[in-house]
A protein has these predicted regions:
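Hydrolase catalytic cores
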Residues: 1, 136-200, 206
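Residues that cap or initiate secondary-structure elements
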Residues: 48, 60-62, 123, 138
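Long, charge-dense accessory insertions within large macromolecular proteins
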Residues: 62-88, 106
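Carbohydrate-binding/catalytic loop surfaces
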Residues: 201-215
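Beta-sandwich interaction modules
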Residues: 18-59, 67-72
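Extracellular S/T/G-rich loop segment that most often corresponds to the catalytic His/Ser-adjacent loop
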Residues: 1-2, 6-31, 84-165, 211
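Charged/polar, solvent-exposed surface patches and flexible loops
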Residues: 97, 183, 187, 211-214
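Broad hydrophobic/π-residue packing in well-ordered secondary structure
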Residues: 50-53, 117, 143, 204
Length: 215
């Protein structure tokens, strides 16, 4: 068990254990540069197997205070590491929460199901993200089929280019902006009848360019 940690502005503390090889480094950032919120990074080296529990205290921790915690991406972790009670929501990554960016999750276009490895919204402070969902499972490429958010992002980028062609090159709406593209795609997104929208998984629905132009 570690003693209670007290932080100064931007301080880092490190702990070792007498009978274990585990080393823990905790870095406190009083103001995270993108949000202004407090950020704490906890790094484990050679962690001992078992359940690790963190107790948060502070002079200004109120009943309505919200604490969010995430694991590092799987490719940066070693061994089996997971939360006992995980929450799949609020798992979009930077820069997904940029206001004017078109943010997409991905789904299987063969059966219409949301893909379990895709991130989900909303934002920590309630921002409506993602904007929509795009196909991202077993997408055909010159190197074979691939799955992932990068596939959905690429398809959506192509949709944005198609919309820009119609708006600017064909002079239908030459003043289109990034926010405007976001709005057009969201309005044209196809909803699933069983979902409440905007959705943490689907945003405003599935990417549908025909419906976007019809709208």
């Amino acid at each position: 068990q570690l003693p209670e940690v007290e932080f100064g502005l931007g301080s880092t503390v490190e702990y070792t254990f007498v009978y274990e090889k585990t080393r823990i480094q905790i870095t406190d950032t009083a103001n995270e540069r993108n949000t202004g919120d407090q950020l704490m990074l906890i790094r484990f080296t050679a962690p001992s197997p078992g359940v690790w529990t963190f107790l948060i205290r502070g002079a200004r921790v109120f009943p309505e205070s919200i604490f969010d915690i995430w694991l590092a991406p799987q490719q940066f972790r070693s061994g089996e590491l997971f939360f006992l009670v995980p929450d799949p929501d609020v798992t979009l990554t930077v820069p997904s929460y940029t206001t004017d960016a078109v943010t997409v999750t991905f789904f299987n276009s063969e059966n219409g199901s949301f893909y379990y490895r895709s991130g989900r919204g909303f934002g920590r402070t309630g921002e409506i993200k993602p904007d929509l969902a795009a196909p991202g499972v077993e997408i055909s490429t010159v190197n074979g089929p691939y799955s992932g958010s990068s596939m959905a992002a690429a398809l959506t980028a192509g949709a944005c280019a198609q919309l820009m062609q119609w708006c600017v090159a064909e002079n239908n709406y030459s003043r289109i902006s990034g926010r405007g593209i976001q709005t057009f795609l969201s309005r044209g997104a196809r909803e699933q009848t069983q979902e409440e929208y905007p959705s943490r998984r689907w945003g405003y629905g599935q990417l549908d360019m025909r419906r976007t132009f019809d709208e």
